[in-house]
Design a protein with these regions (language model features):
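Short, conserved beta-strand element in jelly-roll/cupin
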Residues: 86-101
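A short glycine-rich, His/Asp/Glu-containing loop-to-beta-strand
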Residues: 40-78
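A short hydrophobic beta-strand segment most commonly corresponding to one strand
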Residues: 144-146, 160-177
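Conserved short histidine dyad/triad with adjacent acidic residue
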Residues: 70-85, 103, 149
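Membrane-proximal basic amphipathic "stem/tether" segments
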Residues: 1-26
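Active-site or metal-binding loop neighborhoods of secreted/extracellular toxin and effector enzymes
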Residues: 175-195
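Short acidic-glycine-tyrosine-enriched beta hairpin
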Residues: 102-154
Length: 195
């Protein structure tokens, strides 16, 4: 039921008049944009719709409403080849445009592949075949998706002109990082900011 409500809300928020209003309103309160590694291009523009955190302490001002709400304009795919997670649980609503997201394959997908293979094959072979398997999910205008802390993904393709999303995050859960050979690598080490 909860997912149905989110799907209906996503369709409403993606209506052109509503999406335009949200984007215009958010652009009055810029947040830190994410630049390319060389600092020449914007990878993602970010603006606040609602920031519950104190600017100085970064502590939530409202215990009863721990979510932050931003507008993101994703201009290009993730340049990193490895999947990454985020420091909080999040929900995204695609307001305008579309993208293709890469995520580790779900158990359902792996079971489907397994059922198509030779019966009685060595279980280690099945495990090897599906260990690093990924699936690609298309996210269109009006779609919504959840990404929990510790779930990995990457943006693989972005529509021309970029994709505009409403991005809702919960309380901080832990540092974010990249999934490298099945292990989480801290983002500072992965990006070379920390040796």
């Amino acid at each position: 039921m909860k997912n149905l409500i989110w799907r209906l809300l996503a369709k409403l928020l993606a209506r052109p008049a509503v999406a335009n209003w949200l984007i215009t309103r958010a652009q009055r309160t810029p947040y830190q944009h994410i630049m390319s590694a060389d600092g020449q291009d914007t990878y993602m523009g970010r603006w606040w719709l609602f920031n519950p955190h104190d600017r100085g302490t970064h502590i939530g001002r409202y215990a009863w409403f721990p979510w932050s709400i931003r507008i993101h304009h994703i201009l290009r795919p993730d340049a990193d080849r490895d999947l990454h997670d985020h420091p909080w649980n999040a929900r995204t609503v695609i307001l305008r445009g579309k993208y293709v997201e890469q995520r580790p394959a779900s158990s359902e997908w792996k079971d489907s592949v397994r059922s198509c293979l030779v019966q009685g094959a060595d279980p280690k072979w099945h495990e090897w075949l599906t260990r690093d398997a990924c699936e690609w999910l298309r996210r269109d205008t009006g779609d919504t998706a959840v990404l929990l802390h510790g779930q990995y993904h990457r943006i693989d393709q972005v529509s021309e002109g970029g994709v505009w999303t409403l991005f809702i995050t919960s309380r901080w859960q832990g540092d974010w990082g990249f999934l490298v050979k099945g292990k989480k690598v801290d983002w500072r080490i992965y990006t070379g900011e920390k040796p």
